[in-house]
Amino acid sequence: MKKTAPTAAATSAAPLFANFRQAMTWVHTWFGLALGFVLMVCFYFGALSVFDREIDRWAIPATRFAPQPMPSFDRVLRPAFEALEPDEADYALNMPTLHDASQGPMTPRTELPADEYWAYTTHRDPVLRMGAGFAVPHPKDPQGHNHIHGQTTIDPRSGQPVPEGALKIGSDWFYPLHYSLNWHWHNAGYWIVGLAGMAMALALLTGIVMHRKVFREFFTFRPAAKLVQRSALDLHNMTGVLALPFHLFFALTGVLIFAGWMYFPVSQTVLHPLHERHEARQAQATGLPHQRAGVPAPLASVDAMMAEARRRWAARGMPGEVGFLTLHHVGDANGYVSLYRAGSDRVALVGQGIHFQASSGQVLREDPPPGTIAATHEFLTGLHLQHFRHWLLRWLYVIGGLMGCTCIATGFLFFVEKRKKQHAKTGSSGARIVDALATACVTGMVAASFAILVANRLLPADLHLAGWDKGDWEKALFWAAWAASACHAIARNAPVAQGRISPAWREQCQAIAALGLAAALLNWITTGEHLIKTLFTHTYWPVAGVDLSLLAAAAIAACAARRLRQRAAAQTPAPARKAAHA
């Protein structure tokens, strides 16, 4: 019987994928490729952020001393708070939006009245981060959050601020990079990272569907395989399976942390009136004033309140220090002080609060244990941020983050290795483009993170040039180093179009090795604190740990560069090798 060709209608009705597994493979490949570059940034700088305070100590030698408890408010914090001014950038950006022009001209920045104070410290902080909210006198929305903010970091032993212009590279640069890309225009960075987090959860689930023999693949790794494609896939599968719970947890909790106020801010938009009524009712129920009374009142001794809070915590069987302090309605009869126990021995960021009337020191309220929903949210948030004391878990976080980087990087390699020879035959530039982006995002990103540390040690502390201080120049050099790595990756990956390895990988590994070694040596030269001193004679683990990590990364990068050179030599045709040696 003669077979007839399928009609156009039948052809058009054919499914795009033969089965569900093929569909999941497509989703895994293209979602992972499209957003894997963002996820690489999140995982790498998230891993560095686990030790953000330690990186700060390395970057700011003046802060290299032992962690300190919350200092005296009356003697140290109060003068520091009173010296705070609204941030110039925050004032310029938000004051025109918050101020009601029909009520007259804007209040000058330095004349805004302080409305709230806060200070926060952990068991790893030698210095104290503190800030203030300054009220906008004539706001457009009297029920809104009408504050211009100012922040500083002080030495809690003396109350003096850290050196002006000093950038806390760990907590103020690497840490926000992993959740905002340090791109604050219309909060675009937050949204991109949130989308990437959801895509990662989808990629992990589709990866499980793709690899049905998960447990066998977990124990399969062939580093000596002749094909880079095979060893890259093995390592991709192994790291993805081994750290699967870690990856899923951090992707979902990362989105959860920002869901309430960034991704689904219904309490500040459509439900804003209801939210305000709820806050007023809650203030009435708790006895904590929601608004200012408009009557000036003095401030009682906050040190006495801190002593009373410590006594009450000890009586409840959980002795501890104050970790978080806030003062609401500064200078007003409705002012009150909230003291929260440091959370170093618990997953939640802080313990239950005790609230005092600011003018008299009388206890207004002791917070009850949180309900199920609040406790779950506190637990998940605290486990993600990990401000509690658990050094083994902290290192496991780093390992999990680096395994995430490995999983993503090997996914890029597998994509390129699988397609580059076919693309070389057809003249397609797809593999070459992905390889250049992957090089810039993997080795280029690491090189940029080391370059900012080198710049930190080379630039003078009192630098002021072209309106920028030292911290501004460090940020600029970070982006410049990353951009240079991207340009280098594009310029040097022509061999990929011929089905061979791009030399940019090897050369950027060499740059990482040089930068890592240079950063450790420059720390010794500029501060006199070498590893023998920080490990043995005057042990200081934050600096020693950063130096050791830099040297270890430099050694790994040097070994990788050597292996890449050997692979490239093996791929080079014999006539070309003879010509190169002629």
Map each language-model feature to its residues.
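Conserved histidines in hydrophobic membrane contexts and catalytic metal-binding motifs
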Residues: K2-A582
